[in-house]
UniProtKB/Swiss-Prot annotation:
InterPro entries xrefs: Homeodomain-like_sf, Myb_dom, MYB_TF, SANT/Myb
Gene behind this protein: MYB56
DNA-binding region: 116-138, 167-190
Expressing tissues: Mostly expressed in flowers (at protein level) and siliques, and, to a lower extent, in roots, stems and leaves. Expressed in embryos (e.g. heart and torpedo stages) and cotyledons, and, at low levels, in roots and inflorescence. Accumulates specifically in root apical meristem quiescent center (QC) and vascular initial cells.
Name of the protein: Transcription factor MYB56
Ranges of biased composition (kind: Basic and acidic residues): 1-14, 66-78
Domain HTH myb-type: 88-139, 140-194
Keyword Transport: no
This protein's UniProt keywords: Brassinosteroid signaling pathway, Cytoplasm, DNA-binding, Nucleus, Repeat, Transcription, Transcription regulation
Amino acid sequence: MNPNLLEKDLRGKETTNGSIRYKEANNFRSLPNSHTAACKTSLNNPSISRNHPHNKSASVLESEDEHGNERGENEKSLRMRGKSGINTKVCSRGHWRPTEDAKLKELVAQFGPQNWNLISNHLLGRSGKSCRLRWFNQLDPRINKRAFTEEEEFRLLAAHRAYGNKWALISRLFPGRTDNAVKNHWHVIMARRTRESQRQRQQPPPTLSRDAEMTVSSSCRYNQGKFINEEDDDDDVSAVSTCTTELSLTPPSSAYQPRFFNYDSTLASGKDGQCVQRAEVNGIYGKKMDHQNHHTISVSERKVEMKMRSGYYYFDFLGVGAS
């Protein structure tokens, strides 16, 4: 082969008789118009070209991004873990168990009540702050756990009026009491007072009810110049008259004014020669009760009425009758 015919261009491609021998240029010149349009749209829309099934570079970039995210998450998780490989950020927020309290007492006795981060490393699931609060509020042997006395409650209310909600400052006035205990007991006192005030509001006033009714009745018989109780002599039929006193107290429906009692007795004819003595009551309701007025009273009954009103009774020893 003639060495003059073989030449190299600036790109390192071999040429024969001045013609370029790489097919890419010829193929690019012979591309149809549809393919060139698709290339232009792919350049304008990078998302379409990236998601094209024949685009291998896009898939490679996506796999690199996924590996990068996983690597970042692993580094973050390792950063959150301590030297022992335990995730110290995950702490239980439930109630303290007796085993945890016993373990905390042992650790405080070993390291002292100040190295709380070191103590929390030996107590799984608890932070340093949680251990400190548990110790100073519940487990410290210097805490006074007895009930508050009346004198302490009085001083607590006075201190709250003076200092407000500064519980740490108020707790210094109560040796052995924590700020949390002082605050909780103040709320207990306020709740107790609220219940007592509500109970007093619900109680009815101490007045007589309008539906109350009191009836007092007494009966006696007047026989031959003396009064005899009906329970003592039920078989005696020679009674001249029988007097029955009824006191009734019923509330009226209208407004009232307080008055004194006024006793007004009348004798009304009853059955079988009985006379009924009724009393009108002007009570706290200030209105006279309805009563029965009987105008047909016999002569003997009128004499008994006159004797009763005059204050003495007529005794017929000779049996001649009243004159």
